[in-house]
Swiss-Prot record:
It comes from Mus musculus. This is NADPH oxidase 1. The chain crosses the membrane at residues 37-59, 73-97, 131-151, 196-216, 235-255, 424-444. Signal peptide: none annotated. Residues 424-563 are annotated as: Interaction with NOXO1. Residues 82-316 form the Ferric oxidoreductase domain. Its main location: membrane. GO terms for cellular component: anchoring junction; cell projection; cytoplasm; early endosome; endosome; NADPH oxidase complex. Residues 1-36, 98-130, 217-234, 445-591 are cytoplasmic. Residues 317-418 form the FAD-binding FR-type domain. Glycans are attached at residues 189, 269. Phosphorylation at Thr-457 mediated by PKC/PRKBC positively regulates its interaction with NOXA1 and enzyme activity. GO terms for biological process: angiogenesis; cell migration; cellular response to hyperoxia; extracellular matrix organization; hydrogen peroxide metabolic process; intrinsic apoptotic signaling pathway in response to oxidative stress; JNK cascade; MAPK cascade.
Amino acid sequence: MAGELRGSRGPLQRIQIAPREAPNLHLTMGNWLVNHWLSVLFLVSWLGLNIFLFVYAFLNYEKSDKYYYTREILGTALALARASALCLNFNSMMILIPVCRNLLSFLRGTCSFCNRTLRKPLDHNLTFHKLVAYMICIFTVIHIIAHLFNFERYRRSQQAMDGSLASVLSSLSHPEKEDSWLNPIQSPNMTVMYAAFTSIAGLTGVIATVALVLMVTSAMEFIRRNYFELFWYTHHLFIVYIICLGIHGLGGIVRGQTEESLGESHPHNCSHSFHEWDDHKGSCRHPHFAGHPPESWKWILAPIAFYIFERILRFYRSQQKVVITKVVMHPSNVLELQMRKRGFSMEVGQYIFVNCPSISFLEWHPFTLTSAPEEEFFSVHIRAAGDWTRNLIRTFEQQHSPMPRIEVDGPFGTVSEDVFQYEVAVLVGAGIGVTPFASILKSIWYKFQRADNKLKTQKIYFYWICRETGAFAWFNNLLNSLEQEMEELGKMDFLNYRLFLTGWDSNIAGHAALNFDRATDILTGLKQKTSFGRPMWDNEFSRIATAHPKSAVGVFLCGPRTLAKSLRKRCQRYSSLDPRKVQFYFNKETF
């Protein structure tokens, strides 16, 4: 039954679908590379830098004469700990950049006239942020395990009574330099736990690791979607992580032989005669050691400066007065806020962060703008999807006077800004995910009213997938206005829209079938009839590719990950390797 209903032109009309040929894997991969080569190049460069830094540091600590005696105690674990530490510094430097929203918006604006491929990496900022976080976790595990081995070997060397080189090195001290030691465990009775929690490196390492674990676990999609407040507050532990990282190396636990000592007693000449180091008649003296200077702060200083400037700018913009001009409660528990703010300027598809101090002083939530740039106000539609949004809707439903104060930060750019750069645009919204396309469709309505000849887009396909009929209500007026405007201008072919209801039952379908001959849809009142089920995307993409054989088609989605995966595959499958023929470019809203 569902297979008969999906993608049907009428509510219960059976359609015959021709069997589809299996996709060509080489063609699909080729199309993917054509669309994402710059993102791939950036990702490969980042991975390559991680590999280079790890190998460089590993070989340095594994082969350098400076750490010859340190390796006598610690072995290869020394090189593993230091190599992973260098990569941790590098990735900790990188992780803040993708979340500097104002910097990314500036870069997007600067690249507005660039090729769409050059802008695409900016659209994956959060994906890159997550990848860097995963890399930090991997190197943290390597670093911790290596140092656990190191501390255990320090302890064993200190307790050893066999007269080996490691035991002699562990008991070394210099009468003129109190810090000229090599083994941080200074007493045979000192435990590994005591040494770890009483040293700067050990204590800051434990605190930074706990902060990292809490941030990563609270960022899981289930928690982020259902307990956003927990994710939001816990993620601010990055401040603790950064501070601990910056001072982690102050203790100088990892020590190497000083340059002066290397000149006097080179390990290649003196390591085999360590029993004669204290013999004044011999040529070898016992070596002197110094701690490795802290370097983490050098890596993170620049991104911290960027981020501090970002937060100052956010704070300044959030303090500007916001005037709420209209509040509308739509069906399906959707709140519309229309607002004004001095100096506010937006583009289609952008989003803002909203804060309501009476609910939470610290929580900022992102919402796509549903107004058009041509309107005198900016608006958002907010669906109850968590404690904060439910409290906000409840606050405005109570109709207190004066209205609660709202703070706004933004707007910030997204992939939807590029919609008018394509000859053909395919807009796909799921549920409240239709909001960025409200802005686009409103802007089109204004452009047609003003006879804007600069509009590059020649055709728009709009798909909206909803679970319940009430969700269509707030959008009906806009679609109805667009229908009338297109009809009056003789451009009915410009917009092709399809509404899909997934939460239907037999009563709704039967009622729709009985009234199928009506001029307007019984659910929405629009001329375009509502379809039941989900779109058959292969049919839709094949139809679009046939209708526009030489066009660049931008596919824009605001919806769940499963739908994104499906559409991304279709874009790759139905694009031609010949740049002169149809090309589908997939774009997904992420903020």
